[in-house]
Amino acid sequence: MPRVEIEINPVNRITTDAIGPPGKRVFYILAENDEQTVTLIAEKFQIQSLSAGIEQFLVEIAGKFPELQEASPDYDQDVMEIKPPVDPLFRLTDIGLGYNADEDMVILVIHELMPDGTEEEPGIVRIWCTRSQLRALGHWGIEVVNRGRPICPQCGQPEEPEGHFCVKKNGGHKRN
């Protein structure tokens, strides 16, 4: 049996955000309805992957169900931002997406990252949302990820405000 098992069906709000300065940000996924709020810690690459996966997933749904109205990507930044303090339930390891055609609802199934050697079954959170809520989450996720440190055009690594050691420029360069 999972260490923790939560289902939010449906959510009033689902979002992701990063708190902290670029280079030291902590990424979160938050889901809430009138009864509960669940916050989970994620990695930047997980938010990037989720955002890309959401768009691909919604395109697949539209292909299977062409009669459905297109999901809106619109969001209100004030609603999408996560305000500290946050109390994360756990750090996530993976996210799965599913679709219930009868209800026209999407489910995110999120599993907990457990330390090596732990015998407990990982926690699981199931979040039900509309296709438009999911698409807004994906678009906002891209916005959040892109707010980080700029990427060096030479080596593809993040740049610090004071510059960085760039192997392709033989040592480094300062930002203007």
Residue ranges with predicted function:
Residues 1-52, 56, 60:
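The feature marks the first
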Residues 1-21, 68-124:
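Intrinsic, low-complexity N-terminal interaction/targeting segments
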Residues 13, 26-28, 39, 94, ...:
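Beta-strand-rich binding-surface signature
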Residues 25-31, 50, 54, 106-110, ...:
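Short, structured motif recognition centered on aromatic/hydrophobic residues
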Residues 37-41, 49, 55-60, 64-77, ...:
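N-terminal pre-domain and mature-chain start segments
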Residues 40-42, 110-163:
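Mixed-charge, glycine-accented linear interaction segment located at domain edges/termini
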Residues 163-170:
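Short cysteine/histidine-rich zinc-coordinating motifs and their immediately flanking basic loops
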Residues 172-176:
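Short microdomains enriched in Cys/His and/or Lys/Arg
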